[in-house]
Amino acid sequence: MPNNYVFSLQPTFTQGLILGQLSILVLLGMILKFLFLDSTQHPFESSSVDTDLLRRKRGLEPRHLPEELLHDNAESAEWFNVLLRQIVDVYRSKLRDGLPGIEGDEIARRRIENYANKIRPSGFLDHIEIHSVDLGVSAPELFNARVRQNAPSPAETEFDATYTDTLSLSLSTSYLFNYPMQSFARLPISLTISLSQFKSSICIIPPEITSPTPVLTISISPNFVLDLSTTSLMGSRAKLANVPKLHELIQHQVRRILAARATWKVVLPGLASVVDVKEEIKKEMSDADLS
């Protein structure tokens, strides 16, 4: 009988090489699975997060309304900042159902958690748990108001804007590994994302008189500055803290989403409806694709 089997009772160099490679792969798989991945049904029990430690406050206090507006400066936007702060405060209050303190914080947290799980990609992200939310205390500050030169509309106004606040979000989730089988393992991830700074120029375009759906258009510059601070923990038993690539990925995704939605159209009462404006936007996008 010929002795040309791959495996035999007498080990050969080829057999030893194959067994050695397999043992290394098995060892690496065990290290990844038992140190960093979590195969339990409740990953948060084995990878608890100290939310009080992750939640950072930078000590910003609410800005008080100015006692005197700068009436002598024609380019001052302080009057608009007063209005903008009031509008932002109303949105914060609505998100909290008008309730102060811990009760209002819990309502805002639940709403954001429900929305996050509604839009999450369920194929590779487990349930998202929001631990805490800080809605901030400030509002964007506008300054250096000016009329744009050589603009299509003679009344286009441009501002410079800056926004620094305590806005932050702490959450936990798991990245799902579906190979070689569905939900083979989970990689627990805990994040705290905070706004450090946002800067951009903002353009306000008045409605066109001849437009069938007149709207007020607000857009930010595509060259805006966005700085986020992230605190991260990855892993189950052995944890990786503050992975730089994860910070870069989060900042890139937030920038991409903000750039894609950099233009807002405000429907003017009595001149157009939301449905009409949406149809007009779809038509503009179709014309842009054809051209």
From Swiss-Prot:
GO molecular function, one term: lipid binding
Transmembrane regions listed in the UniProt entry: 17-37
Localisation per UniProt entry: Endoplasmic reticulum membrane
GO cellular component terms listed in the entry, alphabetical order: endoplasmic reticulum membrane; ERMES complex
Any GO BP: mitochondrial genome maintenance
Subunit record text: Homodimer. Component of the ER-mitochondria encounter structure (ERMES) or MDM complex, composed of MMM1, MDM10, MDM12 and MDM34. A MMM1 homodimer associates with one molecule of MDM12 on each side in a pairwise head-to-tail manner, and the SMP-LTD domains of MMM1 and MDM12 generate a continuous hydrophobic tunnel for phospholipid trafficking.
Domain writeup: The SMP-LTD domain is a barrel-like domain that can bind various types of glycerophospholipids in its interior and mediate their transfer between two adjacent bilayers.
Membrane topology category: Single-pass type I membrane protein
Predominant cellular place of this UniProt entry's protein: endoplasmic reticulum
Keywords (A to Z) from UniProt: Endoplasmic reticulum, Lipid transport, Lipid-binding, Membrane, Transmembrane, Transmembrane helix, Transport
UniProt keyword Mitochondrion present: no
Superkingdom to which the source organism belongs: Eukaryota
Protein name: Maintenance of mitochondrial morphology protein 1
Annotated family: Belongs to the MMM1 family.
SMP-LTD domain span: 73-277
